A protein has these predicted regions:
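A short, active-site helix/loop in glycosyltransferases that binds the activated sugar's phosphate group
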Residues: 1-14, 23
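Nucleotide-activated donor-binding/catalytic signature segment of Leloir-type glycosyltransferases, i.e.
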Residues: 63-102
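A charged, aromatic-enriched C-terminal amphipathic alpha-helix characteristic of glycosyltransferases
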Residues: 163-167, 180-211
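Acidic donor-binding loop of glycosyltransferase active sites
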Residues: 105-122
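Short acidic alpha-helix that forms the nucleotide-activated donor recognition element
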Residues: 97-109, 132
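Carbohydrate-associated surface elements
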Residues: 17-20, 31
């Protein structure tokens, strides 16, 4: 979006404000009795779990993941094509209030975000919600795009191209190993806290104060 502004506008004086999160960060991590991955929100035609399901299925069939590993889909309304062999592993949960979705995200071991291949410069609100959960984030996206850079910066998770089945399998196994060994990723909390909504609003107010002199921070 910023790139488009720079192309079509006569100046480049732009400020990008992220969505951010507005709840308390979590430091007391709970591990589930079975390795559990989750996606919170809705899928769309180009951003769907097909390759995630395929990689998960192959890992179970190859006996690299235990057969009782779980996937939770929370809040999706569209019909999903779940491979028959992992249908018992996949649970579908009706849409819930945002605060309840945050609570439910704490009762899993890996949180997944999925972006369509080739989609650039887009964050989702759930990504910022995930940052403060202290759960590993697995992003299926362009690792060189903004989501990959955010996860590298905050050390909150991993990225892999959504079209790379073998790469997705490797990252699922990495997340599984973290769960199995009861590890907690060494997040950079100082950088994560930059993405609270309070701090994002502060950036906006400082910008307005500097540019217009109207607002005092």
């Amino acid at each position: 979006l910023l790139s488009d502004f720079k192309c079509y506008c006569r100046h480049d004086n732009f400020l990008e404000i992220k969505n951010g999160y507005d709840y308390e960060e979590v430091h007391d991590v709970r591990f589930q009795s079975q390795f559990t991955m989750a996606f919170v929100g809705r899928f769309y035609r180009e951003a769907n779990p097909t390759n995630w399901f395929k990689a998960f299925s192959e890992l179970i069939n190859e006996e690299k993941l235990p057969s009782d590993c779980q996937i939770k889909i929370i809040g999706n309304l569209s019909k999903l094509e779940v491979p028959e062999d992992i249908a018992p592993n996949v649970s579908h949960i009706e849409p819930v209030a945002h605060t309840e979705a945050i609570r439910m995200s704490l009762d899993v071991d890996t949180l997944v975000v999925i972006y369509s291949t080739g989609r650039k410069g887009v964050y989702t609100g759930k990504l910022f919600d995930y940052l403060a959960t202290n759960k590993p984030i697995l992003a299926l996206c362009d690792p060189e795009d903004v989501v990959g850079r955010l996860l590298d910066e905050t050390k909150a998770g991993f990225t892999v191209d959504n079209a790379d089945i073998e790469g997705i399998k490797k990252m699922i196994l990495r997340c599984y190993s973290i769960w199995k060994n009861k590890e907690v990723l060494p997040r950079d909390w100082e950088k994560i806290r930059r993405y609270t909504r309070k701090n994002q609003c502060k950036i906006l107010l400082e910008y307005l104060a500097n540019e217009t002199g109207i607002y005092a921070v």
